[in-house]
């Protein structure tokens, strides 16, 4: 048990970079991956309907940039962190996804921001 306690102490003293390097070395030595396995669940008869009602992730899609594209471009830049050209291309290329996999609250907030700037927005 003394050896295990020493290992725990040594691991606790590692920096984040050292822990990441240790993880890579162990993956190589043991021939494994640290990626989490994806579980596949069997769908029941009512499961798809329940999943549609309880949707937790939304895609915020810019349907139309509207008449005031400059304000919409500013909002897209603020939301996504894109550069000016990328945000302009996104707005002018509507319909395009502004944010994918957003929570319901975040998606509603983004939708409100874009609509306040004059854009037409859909949540999918």
From Swiss-Prot:
Among the GO biological process terms of this entry, one is: translation
Q: Name one GO cellular component term.
A: cytosolic large ribosomal subunit
| Quaternary organization | Homodimer. Part of the ribosomal stalk of the 50S ribosomal subunit. Forms a multimeric L10(L12)X complex, where L10 forms an elongated spine to which 2 to 4 L12 dimers bind in a sequential fashion. Binds GTP-bound translation factors.
**In which family does this protein belong, per the annotation?**
Belongs to the bacterial ribosomal protein bL12 family.
Pfam family, any one: Ribosomal_L12_N
Q: Which HAMAP family match?
A: Ribosomal_bL12 (MF_00368)
A single GO molecular function, which one?
Answer: mRNA binding
Q: Which InterPro entries match?
A: Ribosomal_bL12, Ribosomal_bL12_C, Ribosomal_bL12_C/ClpS-like, Ribosomal_bL12_oligo, Ribosomal_bL12_oligo_N_sf
The record's annotation in CDD domains points to: Ribosomal_L7_L12
Q: Which UniProt keywords apply?
A: Ribonucleoprotein, Ribosomal protein
**Role according to the record:** Forms part of the ribosomal stalk which helps the ribosome interact with GTP-bound translation factors. Is thus essential for accurate translation.
- What's this protein's name? Large ribosomal subunit protein bL12
What is the native source organism of this protein? Brucella anthropi (strain ATCC 49188 / DSM 6882 / CCUG 24695 / JCM 21032 / LMG 3331 / NBRC 15819 / NCTC 12168 / Alc 37) (Ochrobactrum anthropi)
Which NCBIfam families does this UniProt record tie to the protein?
L12 (TIGR00855)
């Amino acid at each position: 048990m003394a050896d295990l306690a020493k290992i725990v102490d040594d691991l606790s003293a590692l920096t984040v970079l050292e822990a990441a390097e240790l993880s890579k070395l162990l993956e190589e030595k043991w021939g494994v991956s640290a990626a989490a396995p994806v579980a596949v669940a069997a769908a029941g008869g009512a499961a798809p309907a329940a999943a549609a009602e309880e949707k937790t992730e939304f895609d915020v899609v810019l349907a139309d940039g509207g008449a005031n594209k400059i304000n919409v471009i500013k909002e897209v830049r603020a939301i996504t962190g894109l550069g000016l050209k990328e945000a302009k291309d996104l707005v002018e290329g509507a319909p395009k996804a502004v944010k994918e996999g957003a929570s319901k609250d975040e998606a509603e907030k983004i939708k409100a921001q874009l609509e306040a700037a004059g854009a037409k927005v859909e949540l999918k």
